[in-house]
């Protein structure tokens, strides 16, 4: 098998930080380290420095749409960009966003005649509803999205639930589950690192610590968590809770926690871009609370598992697809009463938490190297 050159196209890429940008970075890294070649194509961004990547990054003209969609949207009709891309001997185009990136990918395919793959990462119906309020325009945006995706030779989704969501938008083609990975190695960080991240917080020994890492948005199930913690406190159960992250709803979330009288045991800290700091938080916690039905893959659940930390998830959610209740994680109904009842029980069962955390590491952890190598094997079939 000869070395391949893969074109990776996405709307977001560092310095923009989101789950899909992280996926593209890891695809580029793992493909390059395997001996193949990767080229990332992404919109220009003010102050972006791509010199630290081990693969080429081609930036094309963009429009600042931060207020609407949270990032700079690419302008996919740049002839100069197309001429630059045509100089690369691409064997396959792998697109990770169904909007401007997909338009660019389709135009490039029309020029160089190579196969295309699309990965569906996000429930775009929710993003569309948040960005566009007119129902008729929402339906038009969904149709455009589905038309773009349907044009690819093969469609991947990061979970079965993501595939079902794509089907609900009107997509009628086939899809294949290709899960994303985690950029953490299996195992814990040194205890000195754990003590360093939590030294400014009141986290007594022998008191269970719950954790959330991610965007501070209500649709992540944060109200369920806070209401459950209120019930836990009223029931006299000792605990601490740490939220790590930022997001558009953070101020409201903090205010609601204070309103519930949880300020003495629920703490908020800003997002951490040092991955070892995030790993240290996973290692300090006793249980990860993630009652989100929005996420298509729940990578944070696999990150937690890398550090032997079990998660509480909503039964039937995408994040819970690989979870067996009480074996490698814990499942609840999508309400605060269900979470509170489980936490009240687990607060007094530290050995159960440790056992289930170890099993989570064994059963649901997948590294980015393994995930991308699986993708590369599939590339060969598509090519």
Which residues make up each language-model segment?
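Aromatic "clamp/platform" in nucleotide-sugar-dependent glycosyltransferases that forms part
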Residues: 293
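A conserved mid-protein helix/loop that constitutes part of the nucleotide-sugar donor-binding site
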Residues: 22, 208-231, 241, 248-254
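Short hydrophobic beta-strand element within catalytic cores of glycosyltransferases
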Residues: 310-314
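Short alpha-helical donor nucleotide-sugar binding micro-motif in glycosyltransferases
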Residues: 149, 271, 279-285
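Conserved acidic donor-binding segment of nucleotide-sugar-dependent glycosyltransferases
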Residues: 325-326, 330-336, 344-350
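Short acidic/histidine- and often glycine-rich active-site loop of Leloir-type glycosyltransferases
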Residues: 127, 315-326, 330-331
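A short, well-ordered alpha-helix in the C-terminal region of glycosyltransferases
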Residues: 265, 352-366
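Nucleotide-activated donor-binding/catalytic signature segment of Leloir-type glycosyltransferases, i.e.
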Residues: 254-272
């Amino acid at each position: 098998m000869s070395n391949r050159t893969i074109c990776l196209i996405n709307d977001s890429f560092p310095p923009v930080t989101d789950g899909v940008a992280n996926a593209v970075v890891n695809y580029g890294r793992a493909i390059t380290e395997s001996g193949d070649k990767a080229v990332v194509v992404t919109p220009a961004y003010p102050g972006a420095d791509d010199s630290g990547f081990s693969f080429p990054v081609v930036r094309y003209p963009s429009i600042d749409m931060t207020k609407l969609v949270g990032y700079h949207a690419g302008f996919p009709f740049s002839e100069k960009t197309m001429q630059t891309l045509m100089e690369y001997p691409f064997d396959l185009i792998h697109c990770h966003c169904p909007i401007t990136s997909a338009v660019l990918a389709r135009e490039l395919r029309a020029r160089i005649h190579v196969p295309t793959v699309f990965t569906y990462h996000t429930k775009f119906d929710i993003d569309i509803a948040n960005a566009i309020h007119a129902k008729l325009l929402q339906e038009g945006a969904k149709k455009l999205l589905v038309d773009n995706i349907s044009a690819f030779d093969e469609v991947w989704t990061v979970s079965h639930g993501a595939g079902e969501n794509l089907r609900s938008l009107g997509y009628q083609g086939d899809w294949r589950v290709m899960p994303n990975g985690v950029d953490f190695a299996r195992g814990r960080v040194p205890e000195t690192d754990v003590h360093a991240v939590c030294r400014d917080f009141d986290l007594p020994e022998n008191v269970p610590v719950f954790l959330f890492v991610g965007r501070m948005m209500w649709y992540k199930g944060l109200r369920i968590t806070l209401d459950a913690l209120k019930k836990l406190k009223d029931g006299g159960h000792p605990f601490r809770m740490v939220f790590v992250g930022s997001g558009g709803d953070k101020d409201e979330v903090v205010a609601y926690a204070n309103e519930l009288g949880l300020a003495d045991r629920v703490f908020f800290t800003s997002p951490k871009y040092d991955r070892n700091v995030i790993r240290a938080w996973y290692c300090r916690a006793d249980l990860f609370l993630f009652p989100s039905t929005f996420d298509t893959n729940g990578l944070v659940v696999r990150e937690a598992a890398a550090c032997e930390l079990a998660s509480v998830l909503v039964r039937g959610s995408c994040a819970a697809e690989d979870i067996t209740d009480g074996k490698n994680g814990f499942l609840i109904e999508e309400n605060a009463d269900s979470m509170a009842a489980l936490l009240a029980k687990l607060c007094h069962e530290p050995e159960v938490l440790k056992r289930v955390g170890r099993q989570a590491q064994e059963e649901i952890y997948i590294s980015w190297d393994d995930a991308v190598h699986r993708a590369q094997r599939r590339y060969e079939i598509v090519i």
